[in-house]
């Protein structure tokens, strides 16, 4: 302590340039600097400066702790955001808004959203009536492009390509970039909540893949389910109020005998609460379930906390 005090005394005297004459006051307990005049009045064995030195110690250790934590604070503040690629094969402004809002609500500002779209995939599936080699190859190529561009997770939004996403699960696991079907967790939740499940879609190409996903989930959970479908022809692209009226009309009778109603397309999500309140049935839409699946994938990779 005395050695430290003498050094400090030297530095203080040097900085003050002789303006104030300071002398070292010390005993076996304490050491500090006082004026020459005050030093002459204080007994040598006095320990009145104990609290002063204790305060110096607290300040020293506080500054030392800040110095230790500062590098980690800087690293945390500059950590790169996780990149989430959203893969569309068909879009509307409402669809994009619902999907992106669900992701940001679930993940806050911890992500960077990358949008990719290939409309020809959906058009070819609709034209052929099934997922042929050409649209499947395009889908796989776009996934690999997102991997090369640095995406951490790829969220597949279109229900019509759900079978391709399922077929590519081993490839995505090998790549270390999860390919998430936006319907997967929604279908799991539907099986949890009931046995009589009604699938609603505006395109027939979305119904088959959703039905197969429900069947897989029911097998995994050891549960028998009954799946029915409702095709709302001409519903895609309508304004909100017109679409809600059409949905209410088409679902009036099926809702009576359903435990759960699921919307096969993300573009229908805004109508979920309306139908739920109208018929008192559990209604599930996929954006929020897709967002939860993305969060789980990023947690598994250690990219978010």
Q: What annotation goes with each model-predicted range?
A:
Residues 2-3, 12-14, 19, 37, ...:
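Polybasic, lysine-rich low-complexity intrinsically disordered segments
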Residues 60-71:
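Bacterial N-terminal signal peptides
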Residues 49-60:
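Bacterial N-terminal signal peptides that target proteins for export
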Residues 17, 26, 35, 55-57:
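Serine residues within intrinsically disordered or low-complexity segments
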Residues 77-305:
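Non-catalytic structural scaffold of enzyme domains
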Residues 69-79:
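Bacterial Sec-dependent signal peptides at the C-terminal "C-region" and cleavage site
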